[in-house]
Amino acid sequence: MKIVQERFHRASLPNGLRILHQQTRGPICHLAVIIRAGSRDEQEREQGLAHFVEHCLFKGTAHRKTYHILSRLDDIGGELNAFTGKEDTTLYATVLDPYFRRAAELLVDIAFHSTFPEREIGKEKEVVVDEIQAYADSPSDHIFDLFDELIFSDHPLGRNILGTPKSVRSFSRNHLLEFTTRLYRTDRIVLATAGPLSGEKVERVWSTLFDDILPERSTLERKGAGAHKAVHAQKETAQSQTHCILGNRAFGGEEDHSLAFHLLNNILGGPTMNNRLNLRIRERFGLTYHLESFYTPYTDVGCWGVYFSTEPGHSERVVRLVHKELKELRERALGTLQLSRAKKQVQGQIALAQENAGSSVGSAARSLLHRGSIEPLEQIMERIDRISATELLEVANQVFEPTALSSIYLRGQGST
């Protein structure tokens, strides 16, 4: 499959910050500061701190109060936001191209000059506790956090990104300062942008904004996930439906089989209407509305599972039908036409995702941040073309082995 990839402009500032820019034709500029500081980088008593820091970055800097931070881009119709993941934190902005420098300067101010006022920290604790409770009240969200805890046990990847009410309420200003001093270092940050400006102009803008930021290197190493055995858990709820995840650890993003497993997961229950779980369980039997499989590859390990919600009386039948589909993928190789269709489908999905410039450069920036390189789109397509039916059988037997699957149930009470 022949696809021409738009080139990225890459550069490094003297202090070690890396720049990645994708030039586009439209008037919109996307900017992001992506920091290699996620929830897996928290120490044992810091659960939820990466996310809490992200919230508090907007509460005041050496140059601005909260109102001025929030109004700086709102006043020109722009967008400013942030999110925290297991492996990184992202601060991002979207503006019309005349306001590129304004957005870049604001992101630098937030990321490098936040003061974390004590009064604002106290108020934000209750905001985050409310966020935690909102997720706990949503079983379709909460079960994914419980599943992570199940398969990663006491490893940082198993911790809830939001933390717990107790951990969040324990944070002080010193905790936030220690965390950012330890992890918000220049060699752990990529500045990602997309827009009509040239790469050279973008580089000049960033250069003028970092005159006072000295190079800081980090020697911190991440803890490996270790061994895993299947674990099963269940919890009674007051909800009407039963929610369930069956799953296992899978391949990390740096492992050879990760792309083949991405293809396999797409066949099983990916974001398409013709995936096997949808056609053979939802459409054929009408047992569930929400049924999907997911695959999250972190740098060194992955997380895979099948999630569904259904009437309590249907849950065991759905589980049996899911196991039937997994068994078929372990034992029966895809035919030539089936494999060709599956490859074209996932290649199309990947190519279409590149049309969103902000998403495209963000994905490339994360690859640069975590792996030190960016794989060209053309090379990804060629690797997909080389995936064989035999390799799919191999990865299916490694991950879909019945005795290796963990499960978590949030059992409902049925209709009232």
Residue ranges of model-derived segments:
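Active/ligand-binding-proximal structured segments within catalytic/core domains
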Residues: 16, 23-73, 147, 184, ...
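Short acidic/glycine-enriched loop/turn segments that link adjacent beta-strands
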Residues: 5, 27, 87-88, 240, ...
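Short gly/ser/thr-rich secondary-structure transition/capping motifs
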Residues: 4, 174, 227-228
